[in-house]
Structures are given as C-alpha cells and as structure tokens.
Regions:
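Intrinsically disordered, low-complexity polar regions and short flexible loop motifs
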Residues: 2-152
Length: 152
C-alpha cells in the first residue's frame, strides 16, 4: 500500500513536469504557431519539396526519415527535452508496483489522454528515426499512438 502511494506521488509529480514542458512547446507564440506546429510545418514543407509521389514506399519512408533527421539537426532540436521527459514518464508508468499489465495501462492511458494530434504525429516521426532508441517498441507495445489520425 505504501509503495503504491509513493509511486502515485512520484508519477503525478513527474506528470506535472511533463505538462509544463508540453505547454512550452504547444503554447502559441506571437506568430500564432507553437514550437511544435513550426517543427511539423518545416517537416511537411521539406517533404513536399522532396516530391514523394514518384517514389516507392520504401524510398518515400527513407526520404521522410531523412527529412525528419535534417529538421531535427537544423533546429538544434528544441524538442529533445520534451521527448526525454515523455519517454521517462512512460517508462515510469510501466514500472508501477502493480502485478498486472491492466493496472499499468491505467497510467499509460492517463498519459495518452493528454496527447494532442501534433504530439502524436511528432512521436510517430521520432519513432521511425535513428533517434528512436527503445521508444518505437514502447509506443507500439502500449498502443500510445492509438488516436493518431490516419490522415497524416
């Protein structure tokens, strides 16, 4: 019982840190766009220039992954703090002192419920890049991208 209370306290403290960081990247600036919107717009523009339509599925995937990595590098990657915090929060949720996966999924669902469409999209892009690490497995195994619109 005490372990669970301590875990809850730690989880929600870290969750609040995540929400603060999320606010910094989703808050609209004077130009009406957020850091996250600017980042996704830049990727979208770069992909349009790359003209994916004449390429095979694999070539289009490789091109999109390369454009994502170029955009990350050209921005000195302002979103890295967000990614580190998000993935740490997700792994914290999965370390809950609960014996079954259903209980752990309660915490994953709390996180997932706070993700915007833009966050889901950038998490998806990141999971397919060379920067993904263990994040791809985490995103798919726990269905974190469940609500990502197929229109992207």
């Amino acid at each position: 019982m005490m372990k669970m209370q301590q875990f809850d306290s730690n989880f929600y403290s870290y969750f609040n840190i995540y929400l603060e960081i999320k606010t910094t990247i989703t808050e609209k600036k004077s130009n009406g766009k957020s850091i996250l919107n600017d980042f996704l717009s830049q990727i979208s523009n770069n992909l349009q220039i790359s003209q994916l339509s004449g390429k095979s599925e694999y070539e289009a995937y490789e091109t999109a992954s390369q454009e994502y990595c170029k955009t990350v590098m050209s921005n000195n990657f302002v979103l890295s703090h967000y990614f580190r915090t998000f993935y740490r929060l997700a792994t914290l949720a999965l370390s809950a002192p609960i014996g079954d996966e259903v209980g752990k999924m309660k915490y994953v669902k709390i996180i997932r419920s706070q993700l915007t469409e833009e966050e889901l999209l950038v998490l998806y892009y990141n999971s397919h890049s060379r920067y993904a690490g263990q994040s791809r497995q985490l995103l798919y195994e726990y269905n974190i991208l469940k609500h990502l619109s197929p229109l992207h």
